[in-house]
Amino acid sequence: MGAFTEKQEALVSSSFEAFKANIPQYSVVFYNSILEKAPAAKDLFSFLANGVDPTNPKLTGHAEKLFALVRDSAGQLKTNGTVVADAALVSIHAQKAVTDPQFVVVKEALLKTIKEAVGGNWSDELSSAWEVAYDELAAAIKKA
């Protein structure tokens, strides 16, 4: 991978703001997308026990945290050229034995959600910036 550019970081940051503009709606898009592709993922998220409920603060809080982590990864990539995952984040993913295919499902759901959040501003360049930031975060979680 080449250096993560200032433009890529700006694309991720600005589209994150579009996501934040309606977290309840986009949280539903995100988790429904995950559950459509991998219904068993419901067991990985305690707050999905009763389905996808946009009024559940744990659901919206987790979605916001995950998208913020990817945004922060973009910042780390721009500044340091690498992503360092938080030890607690690494621990929970190891404890739940999250697999490579599950990381892919989350990535696809993340991209679908951002695409919906930004509407007509979606582009290959925007998609690529989110993909790189997510992939580097996932790699940091898996290798730690």
Curated annotation (Swiss-Prot):
Query: Main localization of the protein?
Result: cytoplasm
A single Gene Ontology MF term assigned here is: oxygen carrier activity
> Phosphoserine-modified residues are where?
46
Q: What is the tissue specificity?
A: Specifically expressed in root nodules, and barely in pods.
Question: What protein am I looking at?
Answer: Leghemoglobin 2
At the top level of its lineage, which domain of life is listed?
A: Eukaryota
What protein family is recorded? Answer: Belongs to the plant globin family.
Organism equals: Glycine max
**Quaternary structure annotation from Swiss-Prot or TrEMBL:** Monomer.
The Gene Ontology biological process terms listed for this entry are: nodulation; response to cobalt ion; response to nitrogen compound
